[in-house]
Amino acid sequence: MAMQMQLEANADTSVEEESFGPQPISRLEQCGINANDVKKLEEAGFHTVEAVAYAPKKELISIKGISEAKADKILTEAAKLVPMGFTTATEFHQRRSEIIQITTGSKELDKLLQGGIETGSITEMFGEFRTGKTQICHTLAVTCQLPIDRGGGEGKAMYIDTEGTFRPERLLAVAERYGLSGSDVLDNVAYARGFNTDHQTQLLYQASAMMVESRYALLIVDSATALYRTDYSGRGELSARQMHLARFLRMLLRLADEFGVAVVITNQVVAQVDGAAMFAADPKKPIGGNIIAHASTTRLYLRKGRGETRICKIYDSPCLPEAEAMFAINADGVGDAKD
C-alpha cells in the first residue's frame, strides 16, 4: 500500500514537472495529432504547444497542408495542455509574486522599478542618443546570467542589434564587476544583427527555436524601431509600417508569454513640429505611435543629466507610480550616480 502511494506521488510530481514551463510541440503527437502535421507546424515556426494554443485559427490554416478541420483539432488538443481559461485573482496574484526581476546594475533604478526589469513582459526604453539605452542593454545582458539571489535570471541573453552598436568589450567589463568569467558570459549571449524589418521579424522565429533548446532569461532588441524608419517612408506607407510593427511586437509578447523571458526594446524619439510642441515641456515623443505604446507593459523615458548621469522616468506602467531616478554610466556598466 505504501509502495503504491509512493508510485502515485512520483507520478504526480512527474506530471507537475512536465507541465512547468513551455512544452515541446512533439507533445501534440501523444494527443493524436499526426506526426507530419506536427512537423509542418514546426517548419512554420511553432516550436511549443503554447505557441500553437496562443495562435489564431487563420494563422494555422495559412500553413500548407493544414485544413480547417485539422486546425480545429490541433487547437482543441493544444487548449487541453495549456491553461487558458479563467482563474481567480488570488491564483494570479500568487503567480505574479513568483515573477523574477533582473537588476539593472543601479540600486536607484532597481528601486524605481520595484526590483528591476520584469520577466514575462515587454519593457520599452526611449530617449535621445547618449541617454544610456544601449548601456542598460549591455549591463542587463550580463546581470540576467547572475543567480536569482543576486538579482539575476539564471539564464542566457539574446541580443538583436539593428544599429550596429553591440560591443562585447562592454560585456567583459560588466562581467569583471560581478566576478563572472568573461568567456562564459560571452558564450551565454546569442547575438544577431538585424538588416531590415523582415529579417528582424525572421530572427524572432529563430529565437523561438533556440529558447526551446536552452534557458534564456532576456531578449533585447536595440533598436526595435530604427529599421522601420528607413524601410518605410512617408505617410503613404504609414499603414503598412504600423501593421508590420504590430506583428513584430505581437511576436515579442508571445515569446514573453511562452518562455517567461524579459523582453527589453529600445525606441527612438522624434521632435514634435505641430502647434502642441510650443506648449509642451519636452517636445520629443517616442516613435511607433499607439501600437508600440499598447504593446509595451512598462515604458521608461531616459534623458541626460549632468556629466555622466542620466535620469530615468516611469512614462507608463500598470503598477509603478510615475517617478524618476538618477543613474550613471560607468566603465563597468550602469551604476548609481555619485553625489
From Swiss-Prot:
Motif Nuclear export signal in this chain: 245-260
PTM characteristics: Ubiquitinated by the SCF(FBH1) E3 ubiquitin ligase complex, regulating RAD51 subcellular location and preventing its association with DNA. Ubiquitinated by RFWD3 in response to DNA damage: ubiquitination leads to degradation by the proteasome, promoting homologous recombination.
Annotated GO CC locations: centrosome; chromatin; chromosome; chromosome, telomeric region; condensed chromosome; condensed nuclear chromosome; cytoplasm; cytosol
Top-level taxonomic group: Eukaryota
Record domain HhH: where: 48-77
Chief place where the protein resides: nucleus
Modified residues (Phosphoserine): S14
Alphabetized Pfam families for the sequence: HHH_5, Rad51
Subcellular location: Nucleus; Cytoplasm; Cytoplasm, Perinuclear region; Mitochondrion matrix
UniProt cross-link Glycyl lysine isopeptide (Lys-Gly) (interchain with G-Cter in ubiquitin), position: K58, K64
Residue ranges, annotated region (Interaction with PALB2): 184-257
Phosphothreonine, modified sites: T13, T309
One example of a Gene Ontology biological process annotation: reciprocal meiotic recombination
Tissue expression notes: Expressed in the mammary gland.
CDD domains on file: Rad51
Residues annotated to bind ATP: G127, E128, F129, R130, T131, G132, K133, T134
PANTHER family named in the record: DNA REPAIR PROTEIN RAD51 HOMOLOG 1 (PTHR22942:SF39), RECA/RAD51/RADA DNA STRAND-PAIRING FAMILY MEMBER (PTHR22942)
Subunit organization: Forms linear homooligomers, giving rise to a RAD51 nucleoprotein filament, which is essential for strand-pairing reactions during DNA recombination. Interacts with BRCA1 and either directly or indirectly with p53. Interacts with XRCC3, RAD54L and RAD54B. Interacts with the BCDX2 subcomplex RAD51C:RAD51B. Component of the homologous recombination repair (HR) complex composed of ERCC5/XPG, BRCA2, PALB2, DSS1 and RAD51. Interacts directly with PALB2 which may serve as a scaffold for a HR complex containing PALB2, BRCA2, RAD51C, RAD51 and XRCC3. Interacts with RAD51AP1 and RAD51AP2.
Homology family: Belongs to the RecA family. RAD51 subfamily.
Function per UniProt: Plays an important role in homologous strand exchange, a key step in DNA repair through homologous recombination (HR). Binds to single-stranded DNA in an ATP-dependent manner to form nucleoprotein filaments which are essential for the homology search and strand exchange. Catalyzes the recognition of homology and strand exchange between homologous DNA partners to form a joint molecule between a processed DNA break and the repair template. Recruited to resolve stalled replication forks during replication stress.
Listed name of the protein: DNA repair protein RAD51 homolog 1
Species in which this protein is naturally found: Canis lupus familiaris
